[in-house]
Amino acid sequence: MRRAWTLAAFAVFLLSLPAAAFAQSIPTLTDLPTGPRPDSWHIWNGTAIGLNGPVFGDLIKIYRKMPWGEGTTLLTSDSHWRYGIHNTACAVFDRPAVLLGVSPLLILDVDVHYGPEIDYIYNNFSSLRDKYFPQHLPPSTGHTHIVQHAQANTVFKIGVGPVAALTLNDFDYFKNNEPYFNWDVATIIKEGFVFRSKTMLLFEFMKDWRFMLDYQNIRYFETGWRNESAGAGFLVMNPAWNHIMVISQLNYYIHNPDFKGLLFWSAVVMEWDFPDKR
């Protein structure tokens, strides 16, 4: 049972990168408004699964979207502030947070988050250099543990014709009073910064169907731990049905001390917008 829990819930670390930013990542240009736009409440949800390492998690964001300007040009057609809450969840931890963000131009999104990481399965260690096996961790302490967490993330996107490129970057800060296994990053950490980057090159070969090349890199600066992978996949959208987006990709580990070979990852994203009545 212990191993089953570990395998089933291990590391939504791959969920956080694309999910945190896809809400504004690939807009449908014909849907973008021009002229004054009303404020709105926006709900965004992404669920991911994966193998090697196992991934199963969900990220939900609920925020107030406050446009500014007339949206008279393509670059300013979705300029807005936003504030709200979001939560990353899986079987072993929750991470509720408040968020504040801005999208000054269509090509750029910036968000900051702050909130506790609540670990339901908590594994502590004597040092950052202890040896460990992610799928056979030592017994849990048996109690819920809270770790302080803050994050800033940016999304830069650009497209010409059927080709688009996205770069998603997360800067995380964790603070705990002892080394522990962080399920999100999937290694032992105590405090300090984690950098996560995901770069995608997309080619739309038919309407709302895109082929994708992907590279991602995760680093924990205190120990030099890193996770690099590259691969390819497909992204399919249907804006008319709650902006649903399905992503499936197969990556190869370039560098990871705990996992080798191929990584499969897939996610389903949907979003809803509720404009204020005028």
For each feature predicted by the language model, list its residue ranges.
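Bacterial N-terminal signal peptides that target proteins for export
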Residues: M1-A8
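Bacterial N-terminal signal peptides
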Residues: A8-P18
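Short glycine/proline- and aromatic-enriched beta-strand/turn motifs that initiate or cap beta-hairpins
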Residues: A23-T73, D78-H80, G84-T88, E271-R278
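Outer-membrane pore/translocation modules
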Residues: A23-W44, L105-K207, Y215, G224-W241, ...
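Generic detector of solvent-exposed, compositionally biased contiguous segments
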Residues: V55-L59, I218-Y220, S229
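Outer membrane beta-barrel
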Residues: L75-N123
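Conserved active-site beta-strand-loop modules that form the wall/rim of enzyme catalytic pockets
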Residues: R210
